[in-house]
Regions:
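Long, hydrophobic alpha/beta structural blocks
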Residues: 2-178
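Short coil-to-beta-strand transition motifs
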Residues: 177-189, 234
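Compositionally biased accessory segments in Actinobacterial proteins
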Residues: 188-193, 239
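OB-fold (S1/OB) nucleic-acid-binding surfaces
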Residues: 191-219
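Short, Lys/Arg- and Gly-enriched loop/turn segments at beta-strand edges
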Residues: 241-248
Length: 248
């Protein structure tokens, strides 16, 4: 099994996967677009499973910050298979870098928050993550605390939704989209922006680092599919195909 990757911009391009036969002739099995992100997104336990229709793989891990199972399309397939043939059955707690290819997106204005509110919000998020971890281990008090917290949140939203817009109440979200398990609808704050040209088509590509539900990752989108002008501090809302790279 062999994979070839060709960059058409900054860490984005096309990967061709296939096999060589006995006469050393390459046979293409499938291709997919890729975008490689930066940094380490998560170091939770990762499980990798093969797709039924072809020799491609999906990774999954439970990150408590999200509240949902993070499922991504594995980018470095050849490297994973090489490690697998060496006897590594499970990648375990390998660092993972996830990134998103966005099919469409919008730029939203940020919510107005002071430094103290941001500090309190981060502390509450950290406490909630600890409660979820404890609840998974059977802690009944943690389960009760989470239930009460959800009820308070529901009550607050029910009151504010009468006068406020949903995107004014919700700062960010990360939730599954459609029937494909590795597609998500995300809303997050833009932390960094870089624009470049596709060297083949000349189209402008916008690459952004966003923070959604306390998780930072990079996304890539064709500028013509993006509504609004991106800027640091504003928010990105859109649909992404989540890809991931295991680090060995």
């Amino acid at each position: 099994f062999v994979e070839y990757s060709k960059n058409y911009g900054c860490d984005c391009g096309i990967t061709v996967c296939g096999q060589y036969d006995e006469e050393n002739e390459f046979h293409v099995e499938y291709t997919f677009p890729f975008f490689r992100g930066t940094g380490i997104t998560t170091q939770e336990h990762v499980v990798v499973e093969r797709h039924s229709e072809k020799e491609s793989y999906a990774g999954a891990c439970d990150d408590l910050r999200l509240g949902v199972t993070l499922i991504f399309y594995l980018q470095n397939l050849a490297e994973y298979m090489q490690e697998k043939y060496k006897g590594l059955k499970d990648p375990g707690d390998r660092p993972v870098t996830v990134s998103g290819l966005a099919s469409e997106g919008k730029i939203l204005f940020p919510l107005q928050k002071d430094k103290e509110a941001v500090k309190v919000e981060r502390e509450l998020s950290k406490n909630r993550t600890n409660l979820i971890a404890a609840a998974r281990n059977g802690d009944e008090e943690a389960m009760e605390s989470l239930t009460m917290e959800d009820m308070d949140t529901y009550s607050m939203i029910s009151q504010r939704i009468v006068t406020d817009d949903v995107l004014t109440i919700v700062d960010s979200y990360f939730m599954p989209y459609g029937i494909e398990c590795d597609q998500y609808n995300v809303l997050g704050e833009i932390l960094d922006i870089m624009k470049f040209k596709n060297i083949l088509t000349g189209e402008e590509i916008c690459q952004m680092t966003i923070e959604s539900n306390d998780i930072q990752f990079d996304i890539c989108i064709n500028s013509k599919d993006l509504l609004g002008e991106p800027a640091v501090g504003r928010r990105f809302k859109g649909t992404i195909w989540l890809q991931g790279q295991l680090h060995y």
